């Protein structure tokens, strides 16, 4: 279920403050954040934000196509290693 239109999109206030300060100074630094639920705003375009995936911070360059999505969508939390491979031993027993 999506968020109510009446409430508006959520952005972590500290993250938004850092972005606005960097835009005012015309800086481009990597910003670390744990706020995966924050919505990407147009002010964030062109910045690199390191989003926490549970183990490390994944750097994500924000482009125009990402506006409106959540930061967590671009930092996967699970890595799929694949199912067990077929070996000679497992196929010979059948």
Swiss-Prot record:
Entry GO MF terms: rRNA binding; structural constituent of ribosome
GO biological process, one term: translation
Species for this entry: Acetivibrio thermocellus (strain ATCC 27405 / DSM 1237 / JCM 9322 / NBRC 103400 / NCIMB 10682 / NRRL B-4536 / VPI 7372)
Domain of life: Bacteria
SUPFAM superfamilies: Ribosomal protein S19
Pfam families listed in its UniProt record: Ribosomal_S19 (PF00203)
Keyword entries, A-Z: Ribonucleoprotein, Ribosomal protein, RNA-binding, rRNA-binding
InterPro entries: Ribosomal_uS19, Ribosomal_uS19_bac-type, Ribosomal_uS19_CS, Ribosomal_uS19_SF
Function (record text): Protein S19 forms a complex with S13 that binds strongly to the 16S ribosomal RNA.
Name of the protein: Small ribosomal subunit protein uS19
Any one GO CC term of the record: small ribosomal subunit
Keyword rRNA processing tagged: no
Family the entry assigns: Belongs to the universal ribosomal protein uS19 family.
């Amino acid at each position: 279920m999506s968020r109510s239109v009446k409430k508006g999109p959520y952005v972590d206030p500290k993250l938004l403050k850092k972005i606005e300060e960097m835009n005012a100074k015309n800086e481009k630094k990597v910003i670390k954040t744990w706020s995966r639920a924050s919505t990407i705003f147009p002010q964030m375009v062109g910045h690199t934000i390191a989003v926490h995936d549970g183990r490390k911070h994944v750097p994500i360059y924000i482009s125009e196509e990402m506006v409106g999505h959540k930061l967590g969508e671009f930092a996967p939390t699970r890595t799929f290693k694949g199912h067990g491979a077929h070996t000679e031993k497992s196929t010979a027993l059948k």
